[in-house]
UniProtKB/Swiss-Prot annotation:
Gene3D superfamilies linked: 4'-phosphopantetheinyl transferase domain
Entry keyword set: Cytoplasm, Fatty acid biosynthesis, Fatty acid metabolism, Lipid biosynthesis, Lipid metabolism, Magnesium, Metal-binding, Transferase
Pfam families associated with the record: ACPS
Residues reported in the UniProt entry to bind Mg(2+): 8, 55
Family from the record: Belongs to the P-Pant transferase superfamily. AcpS family.
GO biological process, one term: fatty acid biosynthetic process
Localization, UniProt: Cytoplasm
Name of the protein in question: Holo-[acyl-carrier-protein] synthase
Molecular function as annotated in GO: holo-[acyl-carrier-protein] synthase activity; magnesium ion binding
Length: 123
């Protein structure tokens, strides 16, 4: 049974502007240390995809970025096959459990100008 669904689309220009203006401070605000360590040398599309995925996850949880759900409570790393895998921490995990979710799935896609992500919570 679906317990939550979230989708987000972000323009690459918006993320590029934040990277130019704030650089590592922006990355540290939205990404966990493990996510930052996994970034490629030119991080624009990957960062935009992760941003969209975290926004989608916050929507799927039904809280947005409130009630303790924050960028660092949502972590997306690639599995051995290169697929994005969402890990929930702290308040994000507690919220998913309160919704009856026992598993969650994330899909990230990019175009020339945008990144998009969908998160589904199942239980």
């Amino acid at each position: 049974m679906i317990r939550g669904l979230g989708i987000d689309v972000v323009e690459l220009d918006r993320i590029e502007a934040a990277l130019i203006r704030f650089g590592d401070r922006f990355l540290a605000r939205i990404l966990t240390p493990a996510e930052r360590a996994a970034l490629p040398p030119i991080p624009l599309t990957r960062t935009a995809g992760l941003f969209a995925a975290k926004e989608a996850a916050a929507k799927a949880l039904g809280t947005g970025f409130a009630q303790g759900v924050a960028f660092h409570t949502l972590e997306i790393l690639s599995d051995a096959a290169g697929r994005p895998a969402l890990t929930l921490h702290g308040p994000a995990l507690a919220r998913a459990e309160a919704l009856g979710a026992t598993s969650w799935h994330v899909s990230i896609s990019h175009s020339r100008d945008t990144a998009a992500a969908v998160v589904v919570l199942e239980g």
